[in-house]
Every structure is written in structure tokens, then in C-alpha cells.
Amino acid sequence: VNDTVDSYDNMISLCSQLTEIAPVCGVLGNHEDVKIYHQGDEELVKRFEDAGVKILRNEETSYSLYDNTVSVIGIEGKPEDFASYGAKECMEAQEAEDQYDLRICIAHVPTYFPEKLENYSFDLGLAGHTHGGIVRLPKLGALYSAEEGLFPEYGGGVYTLDNKATLIVSRGLGDSDKWPRINNVPELSVIDIN
């Protein structure tokens, strides 16, 4: 999503096309949170759902894919909200289930994982938010993230968490509303799970 504009038409069109290939689910980002919680725009969630996207708001869904049962849990908000809006209970409920072949956890803010989520059992974590650090420097990587400041640890890429889960932080497709991307190509992550 291009955060500098209010129109989500391009993202919703992309999501609609992706649902023709596979199930699509996701979580809201901070810009969507502002539109929904501060501006009362629940229509945005409806537009994503009408396009076939399941928006996970501290909830879990599961899919049967190629004889495997996949659990996807979506955690919204920031790490400091973890115990307030049902995210903790959602993670605990998923942890109690043992029928899943693959557990995926999605949280918009990557620091959610080391701060709150890596004590839970999941195989793959997905996040975004940092826009790849906006500016990327050769050999140093991401320059800045709102949560981590200069040279963020989770500026974009693949990481192994303490619980041995893989965390993929996408640089995403959109721009920041304050700075242009420099040396930081937008990305749409395609993850092949074997």
C-alpha cells in the first residue's frame, strides 16, 4: 500500500487477484488502524473481505493445503497492546492445539516477535511495518525504524528467533508518508514452504 494516499484500490485489486491463486489472509497495519479506529472507517475491512481476504484481528484461521493443516494467527496492534485486546489469549489457544502441520503467526510490527511472541510455538512469523528502513545503506542495511531507531535489527529480511521459528520481515510495496525510499526496492515476498 502506498501510505501517502488514502486510496487502497491498488492493494485491494492485487489481493483480489491473489485470492484466485490461494487463500489470502492478513493483519492491518498502523495506517489502516488509524483509518479504522480513529476515523471510524470500518468500510476498509469490508472492502478487503469483499475481495476475498480474511483480515485476522487477534484471531486464528486454518486451511487444508496439500494434505497439510496450516494454522494462521493474526496479531494486531503494537507489542504494548499484547495483553489488552485478546492477542495473548489467541496465542495461548493456538498453542493448546496440536493438529497443525504448520503454524504461521502474522504481526504487522516485527518487534512484536522478540518482545511478546517468541515464547509461543509457531514455525513461521511474518511482519512488515519498517518499509525496509526507508533508506538502505550498502553493507549496513536498513537505516531507521520507528520502533528500533537507527540501524534496526529487523529492517527487512529473514531472521531466526530464539524459539527457532523463522521470521520474514517484508520491505513491502508502499512508501513512507515522510521519506522516499533510497536504495530500497519495494518487495512482495513469495515464500515457498516445503
For the regions a language model picked out, list residue spans one by one.
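Membrane-embedded segments
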Residues: 1-54
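Short, conserved loop/helix-junction motifs that constitute active-site signature segments
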Residues: 15-21, 96-99, 117-120
